[in-house]
């Protein structure tokens, strides 16, 4: 799924929100953004997000409000932030960054649509049933794929063919930090190299 499709998902969810609105909800739809990182770590993503919303006819402050909750890499804050967004009755939750963001959003609501952007496999982590039919109130985009990881490892091997070991750096605080370990190990074994995670 490309950026345009991602923005269309978010825009479509925000556009559909007024149809289900009741007297208790704000007049202008609110998009809740739940991020595992900081504002500086997501600057380029935020610019693309706003540009895509504008292409879909949504301008922050004019016809949509965006509320950000950023965990600053303190993942234990995400469940409370997700609950805040649910309490705010947002139209859609955009969960990005570490896999814990969409999981926190998913645990907080089974009704509000959730659109995720993450770098791990959402099927392997148990977030969705499948990429084509995610199920429930969640859908999104992933930048992870075993094909991508295999290509990255292949390029690494071409750049440093004499390397005897290859290492993968992970964030041990991210509960899905070992998702890429199996394909990484498989590739390392195939080229007869030691793998360090």
Regions found by a protein language model. Give the residues of each.
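Short hydrophobic alpha-helices and adjacent helix-cap/hinge residues
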Residues: 1-197
């Amino acid at each position: 799924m490309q950026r345009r499709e991602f923005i269309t998902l978010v825009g479509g969810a925000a556009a559909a929100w007024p149809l289900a609105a009741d007297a208790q909800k704000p007049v202008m739809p609110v998009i809740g953004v739940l991020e595992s990182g900081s504002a500086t770590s997501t600057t380029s993503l935020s610019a693309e997000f706003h540009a895509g919303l504008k292409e879909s006819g949504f301008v922050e402050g004019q016809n949509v409000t965006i509320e950000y909750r950023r965990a600053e890499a303190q993942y234990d804050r995400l469940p409370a932030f997700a609950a805040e967004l649910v309490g705010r009755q947002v139209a859609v939750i955009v969960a990005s960054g570490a896999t814990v963001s969409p999981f926190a959003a998913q645990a907080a609501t089974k009704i509000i649509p959730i659109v995720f952007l993450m770098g791990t496999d959402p099927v392997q982590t148990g977030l969705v049933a499948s990429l084509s039919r995610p199920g429930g109130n969640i859908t999104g985009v992933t930048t992870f794929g075993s094909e991508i990881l295999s290509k990255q490892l292949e390029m690494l091997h071409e750049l440093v063919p004499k390397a005897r070991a290859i290492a993968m750096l992970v964030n041990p605080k991210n509960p899905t930090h070992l998702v890429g370990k199996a394909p990484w190990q498989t590739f390392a074994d195939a080229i007869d190299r030691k793998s360090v995670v």
